[in-house]
Every structure is written in C-alpha cells, then in structure tokens.
Design a protein with these regions (language model features):
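Amphipathic, well-ordered alpha-helical segments in soluble domains
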Residues: 11-15, 41, 79
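Long, charged low-complexity segments
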Residues: 47, 52-119
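Short, surface-exposed loop/turn segments at secondary-structure junctions
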Residues: 25-29, 52-53
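Hydrophobic alpha-helical packing segments in soluble, helical-rich domains
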Residues: 31-49
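Charged alpha-helical initiation segments
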Residues: 1-27
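Short, charged, amphipathic alpha-helical segments
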Residues: 29-36, 97, 101
Length: 119
C-alpha cells in the first residue's frame, strides 16, 4: 500500500472498530454512522484517482451516488443502499442488515489496489 492508502485504511477501520464497540453497547444507529464514515474515507481516497466521478463531499452523498454507478459491482451498490436506507421512528430499517459488514465490504473494494488506478 502507498503511505496515503495505508492512512486511509487505518482511518476507515478505526471507524469500523468504533462501530463494533457501539454495536456491542446496543447502539446500532451509531454503528451505522461509523460504518458510513469509514466508507466515506475509503471512497474519498478512491475518488482522488477517479476525478471524472462527482460524488460529492459527504459520506452519504458518496454512498448515494455510487448506487447509481453501473461501473461499480452490484454487491457494492447494494451494500451502499443498505447503509443509506432511512430508519423509522424505532431506528430500524425494516430489512435485515449488518452495517459494519456492509461498511467493510465497501472499504475493501475502494481501497483494493486493483480498483484504484493510482496515478
């Protein structure tokens, strides 16, 4: 890994670890937020090597935009969709999900050297 990619990996997985702690404490909402932030870090790094993509500045906008990008594998787009589904008044999405697993899937895809086209 390049030093900057190493840093992105460390920061993204720090968010996943924070999410695991939140989930362990029963706070699945915070776990989802941490997963999205970790994804945002990885996607932001990837976007540096894909300047043609205009996916916005926030993790939510990046996750939303990637859902419609057919050049991204369906399993990654599906994981992004699950992470951006709105919760109901009980803070539930109505689908079975593991936001941390979805986050890890997205992070691994966007930090995989084969997907980076590093300049």
């Amino acid at each position: 890994m390049t030093p900057i990619r190493d840093l992105a990996h460390i920061k993204a997985y720090a968010e996943i670890r924070a999410g695991q702690e939140a989930k362990k404490n029963g706070n699945i909402g915070k776990a989802r937020v941490c997963a999205r932030r970790g994804c945002g870090i990885a996607i932001e790094y990837w976007l540096q090597n894909h300047p043609e993509k205009d996916w916005g500045e926030s993790a939510i906008s990046m996750l939303t935009k990637l859902q419609g990008d057919q050049s991204i594998p369906k399993n990654i787009r599906d994981a992004a969709e699950r992470l951006t589904i709105k919760v109901d008044q009980n803070f539930e999405t109505g689908i079975e999900e593991d936001p941390l697993r979805d986050g890890e899937t997205i992070i691994e895809y966007f930090l995989n050297k084969n997907n980076l086209n590093e300049m």
